Amino acid sequence: MQIKDNIKPILPHLIAVLIFTVVSFAYFYPVLEGKVLKANDSTVSKINSREIQDFREKTGREPLWTNSIFSGMPAYLISTKYPGNLIKYADTFLRMYKMPVSVLFLSMAGFYILLLAFGVSPWLAITGAIAYSLSSFFFQILGAGHNTQAIALAYMAPMIGGIYYTYRHDALKGALFTSFILALEIQANHPQITYYAMICLLIFGIVEFVY
């Protein structure tokens, strides 16, 4: 009886995770057959990072600049490894499924957290999360190979939810959660989406201070 009482509060969330997993694999079922989504930008990215990888393998050092694009640009925008970056391990764990299954699952889970923070019931939040993640824009950018953009969008929703929870509910728990998600957002390495998220949060912060 005690075990049942302990499980009951988290049961809707466990069901949500199961539903999101099933929907993600059902939509991208060819992944289960060993197939890979071939996207133009993913191929171009491998080509652009070739010079960086060759230098890394030859010298054992991490290059900070590449001449392979335009007249040269910082390597961190293309391919840079950070051995001391512990948040990378968390990101790898959260994206344990193969692409693009992992990003679809994360976008559902992230928007689910956002809706929960806004006080939406778990069952309605599941529906909203699926509707959000199955919007055409996600599949357009995945088809084009904009993987980092899709990942940043997936982390954007729970980050906004964390800020809202910090203001309206528990400041300490909300701040800790938001800090963790913000680190994942930065780890996604898509400054454009992070910039848009900051604009949304700035507007929300101004409204909170005024009202």
Show which residues each predicted segment covers:
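Start-transfer (signal-anchor) and selected internal transmembrane alpha helices
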Residues: 1-27
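Short secondary-structure boundary segments
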Residues: 3-8, 70-80, 185-195
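Polar/charged alpha-helical tracts
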Residues: 5-9, 29-30, 57-58, 178
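Hydrophobic alpha-helical segments and their boundary regions
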Residues: 7, 13, 19, 49, ...
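Membrane-interface starts of transmembrane alpha-helices
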Residues: 11-15, 90-99, 120-128, 174
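Membrane-interface coil-to-helix junctions
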Residues: 23-114, 118, 130-157
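Membrane-embedded helix bundles of polyisoprenyl
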Residues: 110-117, 122-210
